[in-house]
Amino acid sequence: MEQHINITLRLKDRDVDVRIPRKIEVRRLIREIDTIFNPGIERKKYLLRIVNKGLLIDEGKHLSDYPMTTGDLVEIEEI
């Protein structure tokens, strides 16, 4: 199994192709994404939506526990 995957991250105003590690917690991934693409934003509660697979991954989960693969379209959803 590969240690990284290439995904398309859907932001508010654009889609961005990024390479991410498979062994990362959702909470940490979203913090890193916000640091790079949305400085100054602090989210309270959120999850990842894997659009093309209909998956929702809670902030306390690890990506490696789910069938995320290269080519997936991902959105961050605040709840």
Positions of PLM-derived features:
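Ubiquitin system architectures
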Residues: 1-79
